[in-house]
């Protein structure tokens, strides 16, 4: 009886769980594997350098079996790059794309951004973006930033490249976020200059004023920081957007009536005294333009050059002369000029009032020359440049060795035709004629000496001796006036006529030599002293009429 009794009700009916749903009976011989429902029995796969990832959920048994995706192919990728060497490693390309992970996470937690957090190189995870409101429509996501290879270090011919990601968050988004947190405050981050602390923030503009358009960000450029031989070190510096006139306008508002320009100091001197303030009653005058600054070479050593910035003065020398002329009317305002290593020159002798004023020779130009040089310091002084070059002195000394000129100077013992001043005028005429020094010959010496006697001497007789030494004894008695040439040429023999034509040619050459000097035959006493000071010990300068007894 007992064996045929039915089983209790509890065993026949399925048990109910606490939630009210019946529990399914599990048959052991249906599927071999773990007893946990919904688990993929396939062995787990591990990625390179990571722990085991969780397997995807098994699809429902009711759905038809889908075609399996092909196995991923393996490819060779560059692992490291060092100079010209590259190490390649074989890795498998994953078939699971990132968008599948995002779709899975979106189903688990609706309304949360499913994209995985991104971490920058060498930093911790960045904070997640704030969740957008559920009421707003979903916006189109920005495309993923592309990664690129950038040069990390550069050493000789070796270059190390590193892959970095381009950030999608632009600086203006940070500024917009800061503007929402603190309205009325400039959201731009503080900028620090190189080697300095943070600059003070600009003053906040009034809330009543309309917001002005922001100036564009200054561009950065590479500038040469140091220069040593053929090596150059470049450093990136930012170009400032604040111009000097803005500082001056700010200072003008703080102290009206005061010159806002910063004081400028000369090299090795203290600050200059400030200009006196003009009267408030006078109208404001137009300010003179600021002098431009330029870079000049201070020192030069081999391939190295040290440049220093110096300011060009706006005060010209003629303004100093006009100022001195007002202080002492009737006095020459030009500063006294002294020759190199000599005392003041002797003043010119006063010419007679009855004589007409002669044409003055052009004054030589003045320039700045180095007076002393000590280390890196140089003292400059303004001196007058002589118009007579050294090659003309050499040409004059070369002609003094001519035998005809030697006999002529030895004959003139009374110094009536060739004293030291007349010979100095010969050197001045050589300089004014402008011929090369090697072209001056014996004829040019006598042409210049004849022209010097025309300017300084009134006696015509001594000049006839020039033709005696130049052409012979026949021409010592011939007058020098052109109106007598043709009268004297008729009774002469053919040889005398030939010599007479030579004298006419000499007079023609004398006029051409005078025109080559631009008709400037007068030489100032100062220039004669300078010519003699070039070589004071020369024997020619001993030919002085004052020493004759």
Swiss-Prot record:
Predominantly expressed in testis and spleen. Pfam families: Spy1. Residues 1-74, 126-145, 188-218, 261-291, 334-364 are annotated as: Disordered. Belongs to the Speedy/Ringo family. The gene is SPDYE3. GO terms for molecular function: protein kinase binding. InterPro entries: Speedy. Residues 58-74, 131-145, 204-218, 277-291, 350-364 have a biased composition (Acidic residues). Residues 1-15 have a biased composition (Low complexity). This is Speedy protein E3.
